[in-house]
C-alpha cells in the first residue's frame, strides 16, 4: 500500500506525490522547485517564488524538491508569484482558475463571494500566493516521498 490512514490523515499529510496527485478535488498542485543556500525558492524554469523563507528550514536548502500547494490554499490576494490564467471554470459559488507558473500547470480553487480581487479571465497575468494559514507540503524530487516535519527539524 502506498499509504494507510484515515481519509483526513491522507488528505492532510499525503505520503508521496503519487498520493497527493489524486487525493482532493482538484488534487494538490505539485511544483518542482530548487531552494538555494539562503532559502530562496525558484521553479525549475527560474521563476522566483517569494514564499516566506522562515518556512524553509535548513534540511531543504540547496536541494531540488517538490512544493505541494492545495488549490484551496492559494490566495488570489497574495503577492508571492505571478501566473498566467489559462481557463476559469465557474462551479456554483466556487471557481477553478487554471494557470501556468512558467511551464507548470496549477489550479486555484476560490470562493466567488469571499475574494476582494476583481474577476479573472483567460489571458490575465495575476499575482497570487500561498495562504500562510496552511502548511506547505514538501516532497523529495527523486523518490516522490513526503519530507516530514520531523525530518526537517531533526
Question: Which sequence ranges carry the predicted segments?
Answer:
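Internal alpha/beta loop-helix hairpins
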Residues: 1-49
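Non-catalytic connector elements of ABC transporters
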Residues: 26-30, 38-154
Amino acid at each position: 500500500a502506498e499509504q494507510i490512514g484515515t481519509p483526513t490523515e491522507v488528505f492532510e499529510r499525503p505520503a508521496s506525490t503519487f498520493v497527493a496527485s489524486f487525493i482532493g478535488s482538484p488534487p494538490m498542485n505539485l511544483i518542482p522547485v530548487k531552494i538555494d543556500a539562503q532559502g530562496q525558492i525558484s521553479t525549475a524554469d527560474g521563476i522566483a517564488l517569494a514564499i516566506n523563507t522562515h518556512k524553509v528550514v535548513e534540511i531543504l536548502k540547496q536541494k531540488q524538491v517538490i512544493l505541494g500547494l492545495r488549490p484551496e490554499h492559494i490566495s488570489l490576494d497574495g503577492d508571492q508569484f505571478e501566473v498566467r490564467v489559462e481557463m476559469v471554470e465557474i462551479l456554483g459559488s466556487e471557481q477553478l482558475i487554471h494557470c501556468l507558473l512558467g511551464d507548470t500547470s496549477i489550479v486555484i480553487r476560490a470562493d466567488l463571494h469571499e475574494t476582494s480581487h476583481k474577476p479573472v479571465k483567460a489571458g490575465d497575468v495575476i499575482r497570487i500566493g500561498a495562504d500562510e494559514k496552511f502548511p506547505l507540503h514538501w516532497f523529495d524530487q527523486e523518490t516522490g516521498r513526503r519530507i516530514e516535519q520531523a525530518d526537517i527539524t531533526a
